[in-house]
């Protein structure tokens, strides 16, 4: 669904149609963005009181102070920080930690991705705007000092790792808290043995059903969250009217002061539970690409925020009139629910917790995909669960890892106290990272004064540092979990990024010069067989070493050679007309081309049967529109994109489809994987034919005809299977990272053939040893 398509843009902003579409998007965002924050009333007060740091007294200072803290935290963090400020810092409509990092890196040239990625992006893809950032001390320091660039990358990766940790903890906390309502209807001995198995069964079902995709039941998410918000707000209004109509007085900041003055250290430590009221706030920014700023703002300010405030006020009103709780762990959501409607509310709560968990799981898949696109995570299998809904992906390896970790923490802790301590640290760390990166965006991208940026950093940073310190104190009571998880994922990301960088440097240093190709003649000194050979390379210029290694050991190759370079660039999306760059290597008679295919870090590289067709048609269009100098060729030694041409639209080719008889094993490698449970279509054989255009030059038509014949003969994918080893004399840490860490990840990750979704029968791997 194109939420920002031409139809919406064509209508006048502020008109009836515009408001109608924004309202529809706001309603849809409830099920995707706000499931997690909507489920927070299930466990916020319980987490604040369950630790034993504060006790509910007859004077109600504790519950009033907790309500005041919840209200002002909700007002300042999600409403003031995210809705009013952070949502404006979009990267071509996309949000999230990597969006902020990408904005900063493109503006000040401080990225640590290989140089070719920046060059491949091109100025025309820079969504940050054409205005140059003014020279400042901060910008100069970032561009000059490599250490600051590494710290910036580590900061972005830290936020990403904590989001992944949140993906482990949120399902456990939400589902366990929702199911805990059963304890009010059972004996103490019964619910002790019932809650954990039921929670684990729900979690297993949740993760086991991920490969089916959410598009079949996604239409239910928004109604469920909407029903849940209406339910908790109505219950809140009832409790306010029935138990304590004057509870609104606790919204005054004065009650925060009374709370902290009375409880002192205990009250400060209880802030780790209070901060859970803003869990899920980061999703407003991370999911910006699926909706619009106005729709997300509308949903939060008009429905989510009022409903949550009423829910927390209602719980506080009930608790303020009841002081006979056995301990703090019994102060929770369900005690304030009237007994007659407790079972229906329990059912809605479980559904709402599942929706909130689904949102964070899907978000984790998207983040892993972004990291993999930017060479910060090993290549993983990405399955597109929907052929129509953008961004609906499923990563099997990550899904099962999340399930195992989620079940482990649930069974290991067995209560919400330790789980919420762990979740709180993950949530507040992500917010701190966003605050730090956002202050740099204000200074470097928005060109505001340093006073404005520091004001934002100090105000919101001070609030979040207080909560961060309160959460970190609970390190031995569960907060060690997100730290451990983020450390493991951080090590994986850093090792993979470092190894990939060293591999690229090796390729650059060992590439073959263009003169070597020219000296061996058009036949390349080998037998040229029918078909197209795609040679995968990370280089944008020169001849990769795997090609010379291949022809030295196997002196035969295809009649048409294509050096294919697939790049994920530091912009969220690349338009289809800007995706292909095509050039020629050597004279025309060599029939060697270079194609660079560019994807944004948010682009979904679908398992599309059209990829090969688009590739061939782009080369054909390049041949047709070649320069008048027929013997010109791209300078392979150049470090720029000189010689490459944008192919906005490939040459239209006529197709004839027929049954594939299976006699040609190197035939069309068209392959599409949408869902492993769908029946694969019967393979087809596609015959390409040139359009009947009499204006095409005879020599050009001959080259095009040869390209079509080669495509019909089949297409093979040749890639290097490099074995990385540290050079003798390298440091101990480098040897461990390269010889063991990176090699282990490489052996257990997907090969580059998965980037273009070619079947194994069309792939040839060339082994090489790379000494770095």
UniProtKB/Swiss-Prot annotation:
- The segments labelled Disordered in the record are 656-684
Q: Which residues lie on this side of the membrane: Extracellular?
A: 45-66, 172-192, 238-265, 320-344, 414-423, 471-477
Topologically, how does it sit relative to the membrane?
Multi-pass membrane protein
Q: Which GO terms describe its cellular component?
A: membrane
Keyword presence, Repressor: no
Gene Ontology MF annotations: potassium ion transmembrane transporter activity
Q: Which GO terms describe its biological process?
A: potassium ion transport
Q: Where in the cell is it found?
A: Membrane
Residue spans, topological domain Cytoplasmic: 1-23, 88-150, 214-216, 287-298, 366-392, 445-449, 499-772
- Please list every transmembrane segment annotated in the UniProt record, as residue ranges: 24-44, 67-87, 151-171, 193-213, 217-237, 266-286, 299-319, 345-365, 393-413, 424-444, 450-470, 478-498
Keyword list, A-Z: Ion transport, Membrane, Potassium, Potassium transport, Transmembrane, Transmembrane helix, Transport
What does this gene product do? High-affinity potassium transporter.
Which family does this protein fall into? Belongs to the HAK/KUP transporter (TC 2.A.72.3) family.
Record protein name field: Potassium transporter 24
Q: Which organism is it from?
A: Oryza sativa subsp. japonica (Rice)
Taxonomy of the source species? Eukaryota, Viridiplantae, Streptophyta, Embryophyta, Tracheophyta
């Amino acid at each position: 669904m194109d939420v920002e398509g031409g139809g919406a843009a064509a209508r006048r902003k502020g008109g009836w149609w515009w408001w109608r579409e924004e309202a529809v998007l706001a309603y849809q965002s409830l099920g995707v963005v706000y499931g997690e924050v909507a489920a927070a009333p299930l466990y916020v007060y319980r987490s604040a009181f369950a630790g034993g740091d504060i006790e509910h007294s007859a004077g109600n200072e504790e519950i009033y102070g907790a309500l005041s803290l919840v209200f002002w935290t909700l007002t300042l963090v999600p409403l003031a920080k995210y809705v009013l400020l952070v949502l404006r810092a979009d990267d071509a409509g996309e949000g999230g930690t990597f969006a902020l990092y990408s904005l900063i890196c493109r503006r000040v040239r401080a990225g640590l991705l290989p140089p070719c990625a920046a060059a491949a992006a091109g100025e025309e893809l820079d969504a940050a705007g054409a205005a140059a950032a003014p020279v400042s001390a901060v910008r100069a320091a970032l561009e000059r000092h490599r250490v600051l660039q590494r710290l910036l990358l580590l900061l972005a990766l830290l936020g990403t790792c904590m989001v992944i940790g949140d993906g482990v903890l949120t399902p456990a906390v939400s589902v366990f808290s929702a199911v805990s309502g059963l304890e009010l209807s059972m004996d103490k001995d019964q619910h002790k043995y019932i809650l954990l198995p039921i929670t684990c069964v729900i979690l297993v079902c949740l993760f086991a059903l991920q490969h089916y995709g959410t598009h079949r039941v996604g239409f239910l998410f928004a109604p469920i969250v909407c029903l849940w918000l209406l339910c908790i707000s109505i219950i809140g209004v009832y409790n306010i009217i029935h138990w304590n109509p004057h509870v609104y007085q606790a919204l005054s900041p004065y009650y925060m002061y009374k709370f902290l003055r009375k409880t002192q250290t205990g009250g400060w430590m209880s802030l780790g539970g209070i901060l859970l009221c803003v869990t899920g706030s980061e999703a407003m920014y991370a999911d910006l690409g699926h909706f619009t700023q106005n729709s997300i703002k509308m949903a939060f300010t008009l429905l989510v925020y009022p409903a949550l405030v009423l829910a927390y006020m209602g719980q506080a009103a009930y608790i303020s009139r009841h002081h006979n709780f056995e301990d703090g762990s019994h102060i929770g959501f369900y005690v304030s629910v009237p007994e007659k409607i407790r079972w229906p509310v329990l059912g809605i709560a479980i559904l709402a917790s599942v929706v909130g968990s689904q949102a964070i799981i899907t978000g984790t898949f998207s983040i892993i995909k972004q990291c993999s696109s930017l060479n910060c995570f090993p290549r993983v299998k990405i399955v597109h669960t929907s052929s129509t809904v953008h961004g609906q992906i499923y990563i099997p390896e990550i899904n099962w890892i999340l399930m195992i970790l989620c079940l482990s923490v649930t069974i290991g802790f067995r209560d919400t106290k330790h789980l919420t301590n762990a979740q709180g640290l993950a949530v507040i760390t992500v917010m701190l990272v966003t605050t730090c990166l956002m202050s740099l965006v204000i200074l470097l991208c928005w060109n505001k004064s340093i006073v404005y940026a520091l004001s934002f950093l100090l105000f919101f940073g001070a609030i979040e540092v207080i909560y961060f310190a309160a959460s970190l104190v609970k390190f031995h009571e569960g907060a060690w979990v997100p730290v451990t998880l983020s450390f493991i994922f951080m090590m994986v990301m850093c090792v993979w990024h470092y190894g990939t960088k060293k591999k690229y440097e090796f390729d650059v240093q060992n590439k073959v010069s263009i003169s070597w190709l020219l000296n061996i003649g058009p036949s390349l000194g080998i037998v040229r067989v029918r078909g197209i050979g795609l040679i995968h390379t990370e280089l944008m210029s020169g001849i990769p070493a795997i090609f010379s290694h291949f022809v030295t050991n196997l002196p035969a190759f295809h009649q048409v050679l294509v050096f294919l370079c697939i790049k994920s660039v530091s912009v969220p999306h690349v338009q289809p007309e800007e995706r292909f760059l095509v050039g020629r290597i050597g004279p025309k008679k060599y029939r060697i081309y270079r194609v660079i295919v560019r994807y944004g870090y948010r682009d979904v590289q679908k398992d599309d049967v059209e990829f090969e067709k688009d590739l061939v048609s782009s080369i054909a269009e390049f041949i047709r529109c070649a320069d008048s100098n027929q013997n010109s060729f791209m300078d392979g030694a150049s470090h720029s994109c000189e010689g490459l041409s944008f192919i906005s639209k490939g040459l239209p080719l006529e197709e004839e489809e027929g049954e594939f008889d299976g006699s040609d094993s190197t035939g069309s490698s068209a392959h599409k994987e949408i869902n492993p449970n769908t029946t694969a279509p019967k393979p087809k054989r596609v015959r390409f034919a040139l359009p009947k255009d009499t204006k095409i030059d005879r020599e050009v038509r001959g080259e095009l005809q040869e390209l079509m014949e080669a495509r019909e003969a089949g297409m093979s994918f040749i890639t290097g299977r490099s074995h990385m080893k540290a050079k003798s004399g390298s440091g101990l840490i480098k040897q461990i990272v390269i010889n063991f860490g990176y090699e282990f990840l490489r052996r257990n990750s997907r090969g580059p053939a998965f980037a273009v979704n070619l079947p194994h029968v069309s792939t040839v791997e060339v082994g090489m040893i790379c000494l770095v």
